Amino acid sequence: MDLIIPKFIFIVPYRNREKEKTHFSIYMKYIMEDHDKNDYEIYYSHQTDLRPFNRGATKNIGFIAMKNKYPDHYKNITLVFNDIDTLPAFKNTFNYITSSGTVKHFYGFHFALGGIFSITGGDFEQCNGFPNNWGWGLEDNAMLDRVLLHELNVDRNQFHPINSKQVIHLYDTPQRLVSNNDPGNYIKKNFIDNLDKIYELNYTIANHITSNDAHNDPHNDPHNDATNHANDTNKLTLIHQKEYIINIEHFRTLVNPANEIFYNQNTFYAKKLLPNVYENSVRRSRWGLKF
């Protein structure tokens, strides 16, 4: 059987966000209902270990997995990097497909390439991907810098800023674990831990199945509003689309997070990063930093 090459692939990084993943999966079936199911695939890039979440690396590993799966075609496939808590509110809001030389930015901040954006696999590889920052912050800022450095066009003709009603954004906790080194490294353009610095990578790709317990509950009352809502949701659940989980079982980067110093910051009240505030041993242990 011939391998069907998708036109675009969603790469959705996450760790410990099962509810958001379920919401994303079900709602995207509605959003993508008018698309040919062979045109796109969704990959949830899942960091399974207890180390701080490395959002840049999970995105990079999503790319590596696609390069390995489609070695002859990945450069021309559109990659849609999409946060797990962010998705369009309405069908056909975005035309995801792009071409070499153009990056489409759909949602986020103008000063960073985060939220939702599209880039070809070839352009992403040329930019050396995201920095593999352990903890939270600045990988999206660095990605925009790299795109501009390589003289790629950033197309914001379909762009919606943060808090736009055209995009659903399920906010997570504002508490962030941030490396003391990242703000200084960003200012000095000194992010050297990138796509080409991921080692000892081990991952598996599994089919993703969205379940809905209400569908099989014999106690459901068909005249009950809650039951009817659950059944409506289940109609979406039964729609088939190509969804997979990249379970990242092991990887190393140039920077070892066990050797980093982190601090915890509430980014709702203090939006500017505040380095040189040190984490205590209790918090480090809680974040999996005590090896």
Predicted regions and their residues:
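Short, well-formed alpha-helical segments that are part of the catalytic scaffolds
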Residues: 17-32
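C-terminal catalytic/acceptor-binding lobe
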Residues: 24, 141-217, 221-291
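A conserved hydrophobic helix/loop-capping motif in glycosyltransferases and polysaccharide synthases
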Residues: 9-17
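Active-site-proximal specificity loops/subdomain of glycosyltransferases
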Residues: 22, 34-76
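Conserved donor-nucleotide/metal-binding helix-loop-beta segment in metal-dependent transferases, i.e.
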Residues: 88-111
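Short beta-strand-to-loop acidic/aromatic patch adjacent to the donor-nucleotide binding site
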Residues: 71-89
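A recurrent flexible, glycine/aromatic-enriched loop bordering the glycosyltransferase active site
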Residues: 103-119, 126, 135
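Aromatic-glycine-rich donor-binding/catalytic loop that engages nucleotide-sugar donors
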Residues: 119-137, 146-157
